[in-house]
């Protein structure tokens, strides 16, 4: 299985500042030139919301303050500027190989 290691496990960021969450895969998640790494946001009592797919593409209705980057094994989610509504859990997710796997999550809070 592809193991996804997320860091940090928790993060506190001031409003208007930048939050950076990293995800490292145990092997490349690139398939035919496409990075099959995605990012989700989850709030208590709600299903996960797709933020970023294919490493850097924003999902439908996702604000421009969310961006993704990376390739191969190393990926990042950046939120800038941080807003109150962004306090949530964030997960990376790979779909290159079955079983699809998730990172352990990052608990992002307002500082």
UniProtKB/Swiss-Prot annotation:
Keywords: Adaptive immunity, Disulfide bond, Immunity, Immunoglobulin. Residues 54-60 are annotated as: Complementarity-determining-2. Residues 61-92 are annotated as: Framework-3. Residues 102-111 are annotated as: Framework-4. Residues 93-101 are annotated as: Complementarity-determining-3. The keyword Ribonucleoprotein does not apply. GO terms for biological process: adaptive immune response; immune response. Residues 39-53 are annotated as: Framework-2. Residues 24-38 are annotated as: Complementarity-determining-1. One of its GO terms (cellular component) is immunoglobulin complex. Disulfide bonds join 23-92. Signal peptide: none annotated. Residues 1-23 are annotated as: Framework-1. The keyword Disulfide bond applies. This is Ig kappa chain V-III region PC 2413. The lineage of its organism: Eukaryota, Metazoa, Chordata, Craniata, Vertebrata.
């Amino acid at each position: 299985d592809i193991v996804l290691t997320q860091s940090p496990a928790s993060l506190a960021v001031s409003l208007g500042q930048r939050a950076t969450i990293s995800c490292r895969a145990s092997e490349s998640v690139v398939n035919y030139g496409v990075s099959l790494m995605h990012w989700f946001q989850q709030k208590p009592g709600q299903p996960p919301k797709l933020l970023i797919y294919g490493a850097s593409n924003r999902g439908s209705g996702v604000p421009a303050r969310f961006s993704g980057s990376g390739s191969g094994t190393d990926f990042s989610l950046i939120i800038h500027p941080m807003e109150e509504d962004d306090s949530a859990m964030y997960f990376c997710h790979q779909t290159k190989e079955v079983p699809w796997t998730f990172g352990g999550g990052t608990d992002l809070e307002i500082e």
